[in-house]
Amino acid sequence: MRVLVGGGTGFIGTAVTQLLRGRGHEVKLVSRQPGPGRITWSELSESGLPLCDVVINLAGENILNPLRRWNETFQKEVLTSRLDTTHLLAKAITETAHPPQAWILVTGVAYYQPSLTKEYDEDSPGGNFDFFSNLVTKWEAAARLPGESTRQVVVRSGVVLGRGGGAISHMLLPFRLGLGGPIGSGRQFFPWIHIGDLAGILNYALEANHVQGVLNGVAPASTTTNAEFAQALGAALGRPAFIPVPSTVVRAVFGERAIMLLEGQKVVPRRTLATGYQYSFPELRAALKDVVA
């Protein structure tokens, strides 16, 4: 298939592109910079959607970038980097004479309200209680297409675990030094997915015509607490992981974003499993062993 990927040059996009090309799909990227096998967002806006069978959007500024202060300017970048690119792709799909077979968007489990007791599947309510849940609601609304000529899929991703990027890249040094541990109380849930499975779900969604609607992009064993995750990462590295990161430190560094680390959701991939997708890394121990190998 001919696949157009928005934001395909980052940590997740690189893994997705590599898998798709390995499966024999022809991939073209939409990015800010021109280059071979790419079009720019401005070219997409001016010329419309190139001929393709599937469109995937992964674009979005990294919310947890520790080098950026959580101020009004950065909040606007977080919003516009997601909403504008999604609006643009959805508009291009709507206006083209040859619409793609599928349109796939990756959002986040921040849609669901943090809780120490509730369990969320794809039909659970959410999306209207803080900046991040409202962001996901607006993001998914921006992607909706009129009619049914194009199959629409939304993957709400958990924390993505993989080599060379993502959340775990910031954790490895202190954990390797034996200075790692739970964040805050450690009781909060930590919904996770191996990057190979997130890419795998996207590939499965574009190849399997019966897949549509919302899928939770988390591992079956992602009902893990932050403390359990810290212990598992320490074990994978052969290091102790008992030194907690105080919530005051997390709030000082991340501001309002700290809620994403200090609170969590128990999310299950009920509909994802029902589609028939087979996880490569359903369990945390094997996922971390692969990541730190």
UniProtKB/Swiss-Prot annotation:
InterPro entries, A to Z: DUF1731, Epimerase_deHydtase, NAD(P)-bd_dom_sf, SDR39U1
Enzyme class: oxidoreductase
EC identifiers of the protein: 1.1.1.-
Binding site for NADP(+): 31-32, 58-59, 77, 82, 160
Pfam families cross-referenced by the UniProt entry: DUF1731, Epimerase
MF terms (GO), sorted A to Z: oxidoreductase activity
CDD domains from the UniProt entry: SDR_a8 (cd05242)
Coiled coil (residue ranges): none
Lineage top rank: taxon: Eukaryota
Keyword set, alphabetical order: NADP, Oxidoreductase
Family under the similarity heading: Belongs to the NAD(P)-dependent epimerase/dehydratase family. SDR39U1 subfamily.
Functional description taken from the UniProt entry: Putative NADP-dependent oxidoreductase.
Record-given protein name: Epimerase family protein SDR39U1
Organism: Mus musculus
Gene coding for it: Sdr39u1
